[in-house]
Amino acid sequence: MAKKQHIYLGLLVIFMMVLTMFAWQMTANAWPSNEELTFLKAFLYYQSYIMPFFLALVIWGFKHKQVSKSFMLIAVIGCSLGIYARFIEPNLLLVKETTIKTGYSLKIALISDMHYGLYSTPWQMQRLVNKLNTLEVDMVLVAGDWTYEPAKNSSLTEQLAPFKQLKHPIYSVPGNHDEEMPGPPLAKELKQALIDNHIHPIEAKTVDLGKVRLVGLADLLPLATKEIRLNALKQQDKPLLLLTHNPESLEYLPKLTQPFVMLAGHTHGGQVNLPILTEKILHLLTEQGYKRGMYALDNNNQLFITSGIGMVGLPLRFAMPPTIDILRFE
């Protein structure tokens, strides 16, 4: 019995070493802002594959009276939740519909925070494009954060190529990870990659949609360019649809004479959505504690935050699955 146990433990150690080599390879291929931190994230990403094997080892130990029942139960619950949050929920893709009262008719798909790079796969990108193509919408809006330390051995144009298949018009603003806050210096290359793949960057620009004007505000965090970005708000002849990344951009808005709906991402809905704890953390990180969904503002203005698609920090999503938000304005 002891000999078998030593063999299993030895195989587990070898498996961990192989996973560490994969983490080194991921780090070498990434376009990192901090190599040590990137390796740590890659290490966590790959070492998470141990969970199913660790769980099997604990159950085997319990059956052979090497592990107590209480330890086994804790391991089963912990590993089951971890396996779900690491391998199952991040690979879901929900579509949610929300109606917004505005007085004009428009139907859009809102996505954000895809974070293509460390924790994503080409399959997930292709699936997102395929799903968007099945939706009956007027356009797709992207509220920033396309990247998360993407691969440096191929161009961003090549990596984002599936979006060229999209049948809807698509407009985008960058997020903080697209503008070195944090992240590698890829803003210029990303903008060109979007254009090459028929995606319209509208940062500091407007798009006339008939009865409403779409305004691209991006993140507004780089204060040096704040005035340039806000110039797009000077034309106020009709209701405004403001596309930004961080909902805290509300704090930078000048007084607007037209009603507006602001669309944002950034929060991931907390990404790991734990009762009470996630709300407390969000309130510590931001003044308003924004999470996801609809928020009523002064003067009948409105804010909608999408929970996004990808992951940052930990390669986990829990009780906050990747979501495409369909917004029906009427």
Region locations from a protein language model:
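Non-catalytic terminal accessory segments
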Residues: M1-P90
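Hydrophobic alpha-helical transmembrane segments in integral membrane proteins
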Residues: S80-T102, L118-W123
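Soluble catalytic domains of enzymes that build or remodel membrane lipids, polysaccharides, and related
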Residues: Y104-L110, H115-E330
